Amino acid sequence: MALKVEAKGGKVGIQWDDGSDYHDVTKIYVRGGLEGIQFIKFEYVKAGKKVIGPIHGASGRGFTETFEINNLEKEYLLSIEGYYNASTGVIQCLQFITNKKTYDPIGYNEGARFTLSASRSKIIGFHGFADKYLNSLGAYFIKIPSIQSAIEGAKTTGKGFDDGGDYDGIRKVYVTTDGSAIRHVRFDYDKAGQVETRERGAKTGTQHEFTVNHPYEYITSVEGTYAHTQPYNCVVLTSLTFKTSKGRASPAIGKVTGSKFKLERQGDAIVGFHGRVGSCIDGIGVYYAPLPPSPPPPEKLQGQGGDGGDSWDDGAFKNVKKIYVGQGDVGIAAVKFEYETYTSEVILAERHGKETLLGYEEFELDYPSEYITAVEGCHDKVIGSETGVITMLRFKTNKRNSPPFGLESAFSFILEKDGHKIVGFHGKASTLLHQIGVHVTAIA
């Protein structure tokens, strides 16, 4: 069954839906004008035959571009990036990304940015809203099957293992070696944002770790060696090296001796492992899936408040889990935040400001289904401070609003970006919180 991804843009005009019973998208017609994208039209492939879809929108003065996707050469549409005007609800720009090419954008890079994508999936259909212009665009996705490689090393000794290839990526690799053989492997896979762990072998020796910054980084290559090794009296893996889409490589883990091998497929990521295991890891193979486009990096929004104190920046994370706000006599005295990293570790960042005898009030999110979309607040000059101080904070999520922490004052502000969630904080602080800003990333 196809996955229907919500349309991005304005939900105004006539709702349309081309459906999801196609095999591929083969041609896209887009007409742009001064006010945005006027219309869009698709050609699909179904049971080997071309199906021409209707026009969505209207034709005015402008320019039309055609994007051809060569499905006969196994090219398929992975994702779409674009911008829409939050006031008018009109799509302003579209860019199409396939497994073989990133096409030039059509339109103007203005407004709220959006992405239509799904992990390890291709687009087979579209839906949205339109009237005189294309107001919103959504898509249907189906999973792209992974491809299993042959096993390198021993192919008959030990027992077979197979983690499968239905994961979105790999977050962390653990390899244990005793100096002559690879004894144990463990893989932390990502599946729909959750970690699933698989491990094989005997954990005897020294364990080495290699962390991948998923979803911004993927393992793309595994190199290694294997040899007939004593005292095991059989062929076993003697070393492993992992390389990523960012050009990083782990050190060679183990003893580089014997026959060399390399598991790599152009344009693909490694999303799973299989092989043979006995007292050691005797052989290893992988599952390949198309390397997805990297999500846009987090964006840092300018802080609001006064200019006093020292600058601080927690950075950007996968999500915010918990917020602590400490109040003082004249304003917010301190804040600290609990985050989840992309490797599923929970960290409590440093305190910003000075803790008072009043302690902290807490706001805990229903993670992972709940996330922060905006921060509202107030700032003002107060007695004892030459520059502005944050006097009130309130956090808005996709489900609810927090109570206000502190008191409203002269100057109010809001930190948010349409279509984005808050994944980190920065600001300025002394014995009080003078300024606060946020890091945001597009909501998947």
Curated annotation (Swiss-Prot):
Name the Gene3D superfamilies for this protein. Answer: Jacalin-like lectin domain (2.100.10.30)
Q: Which CDD domains match?
A: Jacalin
In alphabetical order, the GO MF annotations are:
carbohydrate binding
Residues annotated with N-acetylalanine modification: 2
Organism domain of life: Eukaryota
Q: Which residues form a coiled coil?
A: none
**Record keywords, A-Z:** Acetylation, Lectin, Repeat
The signal sequence is: none
Membrane-crossing residues?
Answer: none
- Jacalin-type lectin domain ranges (all copies): 2-143, 146-290, 298-442
Into which family does the record put it? Belongs to the jacalin lectin family.
- Could you identify this protein by its name? Jacalin-related lectin 11
Where does this protein come from, organism-wise? Answer: Arabidopsis thaliana
